[in-house]
Amino acid sequence: MDCNCFDPLLPADELLMKYQYISDFFIAVAYFSIPIELVYFVQKSAVFPYRWVLVQFGAFIVLCGATHLINLWTSTPHTRTVAMVMTTAKFSTAAVSCATAVMLVHIIPDLLSVKTRELFLKNKAAELDREMGLIRTQEETGRYVRMLTHEIRSTLDRHTILKTTLVELGRALQLEECALWMPTRTGVELQLSYTLHHQNPVGFTVPIQLPVINQVFSANCAVKISPNSAVARLRPTRKYIPGEVVAVRVPLLHLSNFQTNDWPELSPKSYALMVLMLPSNSARQWHVHELELVDVVADQVAVALSHAAILEESMRARDLLIEQNVALDLARREAETAVRARNDFLGVMNHEMRTPMHAVVALSSLLQESELIPEQRLMVETILKSSNLLATLINDVLDLSRLEDGSLQLDVGTFNLHALFREVLNLIKPVAAVKKLFVTLSLSSDFPEVAIGDEKRLMQILLNVVGNAVKFSKEGSVSVSAVNAKSESLIDPRAPEFFPVQSENHFYLRVQVKDTGSGINPQDFPKLFCKFAQNQEPATKNSAGTGLGLAICKRFVNLMEGHIWIESEGVGKGSTAIFIVKLGIPGRLNESKLPFTAGLPANHMQMTFQGLKVLVMDDNGFSRMVTKSLLVHLGCDVTTIGSGDECLRILTREHKVLIMDASITGMNCYDVAVSVHEKFGKRLERPLIVALTGNTDQVTKENCLRVGMDGVILKPVSIDKMRSVLSGLLEHGTVL
């Protein structure tokens, strides 16, 4: 039997029931949709710490929705089954609700702590945002610094550097004005040198001792200063509030080796002043990163300015060096011109002096061999010795000139070393005998008899050194000793740079000349080897000499890779001259092309040349006559001519010797020699060709030999010298 517990509803109640039906339906739909949404988003979330709470909460919502849905059938008469379902649903909802409420007691504190952590994370996020802002600011500052550094370093012109700095700072920091004050040369004022908006700023100056300037110069970073300070009054007067102003010092680095002319004389601490102004009537202020940017740029400008100063000074030094090089080159050319003029003058004087000397020596030697009374013979010998002394003096001057310009070369040949020493002693002994000096010669047992070197220069050294010993000795003795020097005897402690090296192909000749003469004052040692310098002691003032001997000897010794020095214990205690020269050993060098210049045998001195046909070519009639006289005296059949053309016309195979003056005008002697070779062809059919010259240079000798001449004779020529020349020609076919 059905149970009907409800009374029939009125029409108004039916309307209310419809609204309740609709409300319960939508409540149920909402309750059912919420768990679906929760499940969807929880699955999308990677981390969710309260999944069981979510399950309980979802069950609670679903049961609540179920009660509202079941309630649709309980508003009208219903069966017992519906009542049981409704009761079960409500009981389940109550159980789940209580369990969820109990669980929330434990969860709510965690949820509150989550909120706290959320606030903490928000604070951390804000702090990270600030740090990121600082990093971005630093990166931006670094970018500006790199950009400014690149612009500044792109040039080394300091005006461009400073102008670029102001322009780039103005663009980067959006400045209204930027100015640079440089110290004046006096260093007591700062002068306005560069501004951002004025191409040619008026040179305002302010005292460097102003408090605001001292404040900036004493700080290591940019400093805010008053917009009304003296260095900041660069903007036009307006009613707007002026923007903030900062100033920073720019170190002018001290450069000890460089000084720019239009910069001040820098002290160890000298600064320029850079002033930067923000736009007027703006609320903008200077930030820390902007001030840091200004500091970095100031340091970069200081470095760039130092580089620019170095470059400017280097360019100035380069220009000065170029000017000095031009002046030196001009001086060198003038010196070379002077040397050439001197050499030309000496060459001309040498030739012009030797030509008349040739006549004096030749005629004096002819007179010497004639029948003369003792007084006449003495006068002739005096004339001959004086002429030879004059010739020696000319040779000394020419040799010294060539030694100084490096044109003198050794005439190397094979010679008899023993004969050379004996000849020197034979020349010195007559002078020593007059002064009653005892002269001795000592040659070591291992002393080589034959050597390779310049015999003439070695004899000149010996004659000078031994001659000085005789000249400055009034009594006593002069001893000459020569040894084949060993390593221990080659060292002079006063000349450590002289370090000879022994070899199998060479040996070192050590000559010592000791006398008992006037000695040497220690203060005169530095002047001994200077040209035209002589000992100033009273005992030696009257001694003859030009002061060239030892100077030339030293240069000859140096050419022979040797060393020369003089020792003396003082005035009146004598002196010892020692020299070492390097000579070659025959048989161990390739001396096949070296001439042998040993002395001629004595019987050559007595030879006559009766009937020897000789042709003499000289355009100087006086010199031609003198040469002819010498040859006629020797018994030669002499023909004289004055030109090269005449020589080639007259010269025949009957002529055995052709003597030509090397300085003949017109067809010169070289052309004549070449023509003679062409005319006669074979060597045995042509005459022997000899040049007679007053030029002592090696070039003349080489030119003569190059064109096929057989020898060169240097003026002046005595009868003995002419006899030796002819003997050498006829015996060896050459004379050097």
From Swiss-Prot:
Leaves, flowers and fruits. It is found in: Endoplasmic reticulum membrane. Residues 348-585 form the Histidine kinase domain. One of its GO terms (cellular component) is endoplasmic reticulum membrane. The keyword Transmembrane applies. Its cofactor is Cu cation. Activation probably requires a transfer of a phosphate group between a His in the transmitter domain and an Asp of the receiver domain. Residues 157-305 form the GAF domain. Binds 1 copper ion per dimer. Its EC number is 2.7.13.3. Induction: Not induced by ethylene. SMART domains: GAF, HATPase_c, HisKA, REC. Residues 613-730 form the Response regulatory domain. The modification Phosphohistidine is found at H351. Cu cation binds at C64, H68. It comes from the Eukaryota. This is Ethylene receptor 2. The gene is ETR2.
